Amino acid sequence: MKDNETIIFKPTYTPNQNWVKELDPRHMDSTLSAFTAPKNDKRVITLCRPFVVIPKTSYSSPVTLPLGLAYVASVLDKAGYKTKIIDATGEQRPVKIKRTSNNLYNLQGLTSEEILERIDPNTFIFGISLMFSSEWFAHRTLIEKIKKKYPKIIIVAGG
């Protein structure tokens, strides 16, 4: 290509082509009908709220109910998908707090190994709630362990 040469981009579709179905967000049923689960699908979507990472010097804990995951699971259930929730912070009884190897953070909740044990073998999508960037170092290790044990799982992370 020469410096003065103009590149003309020609789209492969016409601008008036209706290739995206318009959905009315005010009507959940019409929206869900576009995303319904395949019939007799035994696969599972697992949603996880991992353990909480708390700075050692913190006097408060950001532990809250995983309402976001509950909302997502509710919509997926309504669309016909099989869902499971792992609340790694709320499921651990009695509550145990562990210190990280660098002695800077406390971890509250199930360990990575305990989370791995709770993942349904039929899981094809694993959604993980990553609310705070300060937790990324610990949750990344969890994601790596999940991918190693279940290499075909699609992992979706969000906050």
Task: Specify the residue positions occupied by each region the protein language model found.
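A short, structured N-terminal alpha-helical element that caps or precedes a catalytic domain
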Residues: 1-158
